[in-house]
Amino acid sequence: METLSFEFAAGQPARGKALVGVVGSGDLEVLLEPGQAGKLAIQVVTSVNGAEQRWQQLFERMFREQTPPALNIDIHDFGATPGVVRLRLEQGLEEVGHD
């Protein structure tokens, strides 16, 4: 198991919380909670050692296209593909944007 941390610029804190995915379903669980204004903090606990660059590139692609709300994101990964990771993150971002 490896724990990775990432930070990105963000907007204002999100309005809500979200939990998407289940570790046993698609091998990924993502918890999103409001964070500190201007900061997106992501912590990834993964069973895949040596994948930090893959995670960094995925997040950079996602957040280059849009400015995310300020969030603390915890990801529990057991070998999910980048497509599943992006899908779950997009689902979570959609969820925290609703009242």
Curated annotation (Swiss-Prot):
<keyword id="KW-0597">Phosphoprotein</keyword>
<dbReference type="Pfam" id="PF06857">
    <property type="entry name" value="ACP"/>
</dbReference>
<keyword id="KW-0963">Cytoplasm</keyword>
<dbReference type="GO" id="GO:0000036">
    <property type="term" value="F:acyl carrier activity"/>
</dbReference>
<feature type="modified residue" description="O-(phosphoribosyl dephospho-coenzyme A)serine">
    <location>
        <position position="25"/>
    </location>
</feature>
<comment type="similarity">
    <text>Belongs to the MdcC family.</text>
</comment>
<dbReference type="InterPro" id="IPR009662">
    <property type="entry name" value="Malonate_deCO2ase_dsu"/>
</dbReference>
<protein>
    <recommendedName>
        <fullName>Malonate decarboxylase acyl carrier protein</fullName>
    </recommendedName>
</protein>
<dbReference type="GO" id="GO:0005737">
    <property type="term" value="C:cytoplasm"/>
</dbReference>
<dbReference type="InterPro" id="IPR023439">
    <property type="entry name" value="Mal_deCO2ase/Cit_lyase_ACP"/>
</dbReference>
<comment type="function">
    <text>Subunit of malonate decarboxylase, it is an acyl carrier protein to which acetyl and malonyl thioester residues are bound via a 2'-(5''-phosphoribosyl)-3'-dephospho-CoA prosthetic group and turn over during the catalytic mechanism.</text>
</comment>
